[in-house]
């Protein structure tokens, strides 16, 4: 009697998980680090796990189910850790409908989506399906088999119920029928009913009280009845499921009535006993008459009939209790011992996360935002200090300090100028600047080409998508490329803006270079040439040891100390490192969301508060020193002898000092620009890879969608058949009855029966046909046979009956036909009939029209009878 329903597994196409995940890991984590290598190995293991779980047929045992559960747990674990989407990590998963068997012109229905939620739903479906198959394979004659079956049916019910609640939110479009909410909801109820049936079998085996067994059976009957009601009006499950559900409903109801009748007998309610046994017998009779192909209830039927016969006999001879109507009986109670097992990840008890140390995407995004805030704070503080240093150098250069207090002889190069000259020469001089400026346009052009190529890929794919959308209209059901590419195009626009600003910055650097190139060239010359290029002046009166010179030297020394302190502060700002991962993870665990701004600002104030205070103090200290230097320099200028030669010399020295500052700034800016372009190249290459990956994924999705569209178009019914013209329906000059409509092509051809004996050969016109010729049963009024043309030869065999025959039942014996002629070829496939083949004068007639004949000989085909 026990017939259990199990679910077929869905089939999928192979997907390489490792390649896109490894790309993301390499772009996200530092190159060459142990962390990156570990995650790359984990991605390879994940790809192997998918192949083991869904890429091959699975046996019906616990080990195969454990592999499926491990894969499901793993994809649930990585979902928050990787940005799976159509425009980031784009993985297209293709799954076939588990219940669709395909058609003549195409395979089974399948759906391809770039959604990890879709993959999760399909894998969980397979977990439930395999659990149902394992449960159905159990030996229910022992407690262990009953226990395993009940556990797996309840798990399958919970898994199907989980899919019902989550599938629509996980997918961006309608799912296939097998994972639609209606279908999985029905499957969940079927699995729950079978779990209840297992508990009923357990109670029966343990010989529990009949009242309890009756309640368990009645509850199982309700579950089966509800499942049957849900699916009988929807063509979603295989057809063989419906009769099994109906039979199980009746059988469980009969069991409930049977055990309740035993309870009634114990309570001396003999009339109720008979009424319940009669109802049980009727239910089992219905099952035996309608569903005997699916379930065997002979033993149970005999058991009920024996009990009913004994009860009637005892009641008729002893008790004489009135047999009540069924509607007057008290309803049987219900007791459920099953419930759908909720899906709580991890499901597998042996699960180990391959990416255990990887943080969720929300934490990664918060860390990226925190690092950006940190970089902004550090860069802002460093920029303030560098601007202050540049300002100080500019003020000193305009005052010709410290060269003014060093140049007392008027005919030698001041020591500060010599130091700056040696520094310029050591850094490569003007040749370094020339080389760096020459490289900038090449770097810029390379970046532009990468960006243009990336956007070209998007443009081409979008144009193709638009063309196909215009061609197929509403059939083209996927996200439009122009919507999908909006983030990428915004990113590309941002890169374009960055390049435009870089071009402007390059122009400013070149302008500065042209303005100060000659002075920098002079600063690169040897000391004798440099000294010769500087105008000499009359020896100034000795001011060494004067108070104003000593004050200036002290102020300049303090300013140098401030500059050195800034270098230390800059290093301190760059070296501070604090990992916010733990704080973000704690916030995510406690609140479910991360308030990144509040957490980051608080932590940055704590870590960098002291350093930023020192930066502001350094700026204020420099401001005071520069004011004092300017005041002291005014006094120094008044004391210094003034003449034209001295003024000209001082101007040249100022220009040389300014040239040094400009050289340092140019080299720094050019190196920064080169570094910027090289780093931008890496970013643009990643952007190009991202564009290339998504375009490739879209092309793959497009090909799958086109294939599905072709199959769906092929499955669509063709145009209505053209009605047969009137002149083809009967021979000329006759009114023979219309032949029966040929069988539809979906009906298997009926095996032909031996035909009736044919009538005797047609005699000459002066002799009548034999009145004793046999007539086939059911034939209509025969049309007169065509008269024999005088002088023509008689036919080589008996003429066939001049009346139509029904499909599959030819009414005449096969006679020699023209080469290639097959009178059954078109009739088997319901093809339209061409015009009647007219006979030539003097030609022996063909048999009467069974079906319209053919205008030309057809290729040889296999007929029902061998050709003679």
From Swiss-Prot:
Segments for region (Self-association): 503-868
Recorded consequence of changing residue 512 to A: No effect on interaction with HIV-1 p6; impairs rescue of PTAP-type L domain-deficient HIV-1 p6
Modified residues (Phosphoserine): 481, 730
Residue segments, region Interaction with EIAV p9: 176-868
GO cellular component term, pick one: cytosol
Pfam families with a match to the protein in the record: ALIX_LYPXL_bnd, BRO1
One Gene Ontology biological process: extracellular exosome biogenesis
Region (Disordered): 713-809, 832-868
Omega-N-methylarginine modified-residue sites: 745
Chain positions with N-acetylalanine modification: 2
Chain positions covered by the region annotation Interaction with CEP55: 801-806
Gene Ontology terms, MF aspect: calcium-dependent protein binding; protein homodimerization activity; proteinase activated receptor binding
Keyword set, alphabetical order: Acetylation, Apoptosis, Cell cycle, Cell division, Cell junction, Cytoplasm, Cytoskeleton, Host-virus interaction, Intellectual disability, Methylation, Phosphoprotein, Primary microcephaly, Protein transport, Secreted, Tight junction, Transport
Annotated region described as Essential to promote virus budding, given as residue ranges: 864-868
Extent of Low complexity compositional bias: 778-791
Family annotation (InterPro entries): ALIX_V_dom (IPR025304), BRO1_dom (IPR004328), BRO1_sf (IPR038499)
Region (Interaction with CHMP4A, CHMP4B and CHMP4C): 176-503
BRO1 domain ranges (all copies): 3-392
PTM description: May be phosphorylated on tyrosine residues by activated PDGFRB.
Location of the protein in the cell: Cytoplasm, Cytosol; Melanosome; Cytoplasm, Cytoskeleton, Microtubule organizing center, Centrosome; Secreted, Extracellular exosome
Disease connection: Microcephaly 29, primary, autosomal recessive: A form of microcephaly, a disease defined as a head circumference more than 3 standard deviations below the age, sex and ethnically matched mean. Brain weight is markedly reduced and the cerebral cortex is disproportionately small. MCPH29 is characterized by small head circumference apparent at birth and associated with global developmental delay, impaired intellectual development, speech delay, and behavioral abnormalities. Affected individuals also have poor overall growth with short stature, mild dysmorphic facial features, and seizures.
Name listed for the protein in its UniProt record: Programmed cell death 6-interacting protein
